[in-house]
Amino acid sequence: MLCRRATLPLLAVVAVGAAALVASCSGDDTTIGSPAPSTVDTGSIPGDSVPGDSVPPVLDVTAGEAFPAARCEANRTAGTITYLSSYDFAASASIIDVLVADSKGYYDALCLDVNITPSFSTENYPLIAANDAQFSSGGSFSEMVDFAGANDAGFVALAVEGRTGIDALITKDGEVPTLADVKGKKIGVKGAITPSVKAMLAKEGLVEGIDYETVNVEGFDPLAHIEIPDIIGFPGFKSNEPKQLEAAGIPFKLYDPSDFGIPGSFGVLYTNLTFLAEHPTAAQDFMRATMRGLADAVADPAAAAQVAVDVLNASGNALFLSPEGETARWAVESKLVSETATPDAPLGLPLVDDLTIEVTEYAEIGLFEGVPPLIETMVDASVLDGVYDDTGTVIWPAD
């Protein structure tokens, strides 16, 4: 049973700072840093739109009403918010929604100064851990959890847009008749093997570094990677590399982890505990604007893909991504993202039970050193819970 009103262990401490800011903006003698109660009982205050959350009711956003001036000031205090994409400006979940939101002025409308920077998922984790950037796009929840351990970092997933795995193992035609034939071979990877593929192989008794090797491949061109003689294949996104190979008429065999009973996720938007604690309204409103961008992108996939293509071209398109490829990519991903959304589980809302199953099953077959990670501090569904109304619509102030 899904419970959207989650408890808030991560943000219990930030209500004090937010309450102080409200007082300072309202002319009260209290200023930021003044003594204040250690807790704020918002659950008992009439009119609180999200009882029990970390934001005092006076800062709540109400649909169709003016954006609170004190909240605007709090958001401006956050300064420039840097978002790092996970694959240049591709038309992909947790990237395209940010691009659409920016193109429509949604961040500006909520008093947010957002700097959108192209990058690659595995390069971003240390930067988010150090708070050198505040938001990023992760390949999957398990990828984020894995890097959290590697970086000893306080990552927090605020949205998980894809509730199934997006990655698969793409192998050369005729070279891998069954998964067992991966044994003793090399797989090309971009930084690291993707979690779902690693879990799929582990379930078949194939362990990285023992039964097969992984080697880094340069660039992002599957047409070049499929020709590398020393590897039998490489992980890729079902919405990307297979489409390019099919368009080029190159045969291949795809192993989809979901066909082997492997749970997964994709399109993760995450931040760090430091930023979330210091700037709770800015963090929530970044997600509010982004989820509105996601709703627009799902409603009109072709128009959203064109936004991504325009941004790619304006920034030099370093990966030479094609308009046709990006349109095809988002056509696949938008369907995967939207088909699991309901009023109780709207677009992007992290489903903690499902994520727990994901990391637990991965641990049982050897990932995370065989120990299921504790994810309570690594995901916070309450942030998006406060962004959506009971119909699953983003709560948006008057223009």
Where are these regions (language model features)?
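Bacterial N-terminal signal peptides that target proteins for export
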Residues: 1-11
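C-terminal motif of bacterial Sec signal peptides marking the signal peptidase cleavage site
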Residues: 20-24
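Bacterial lipoprotein signal-peptidase II cleavage site
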Residues: 25-35
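Short, glycine-/small- and polar/acidic-enriched structural segments
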Residues: 40, 45, 52-232, 236, ...
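Conserved C-terminal helix/tail region of periplasmic/extracytoplasmic solute-binding proteins
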Residues: 55-58, 352-399
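Surface-exposed patches in mature extracellular/periplasmic domains of secreted proteins
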Residues: 116-117, 155-157, 214, 256, ...
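Pocket-lining segment of extracytoplasmic ligand-binding domains
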Residues: 222-223, 227-319
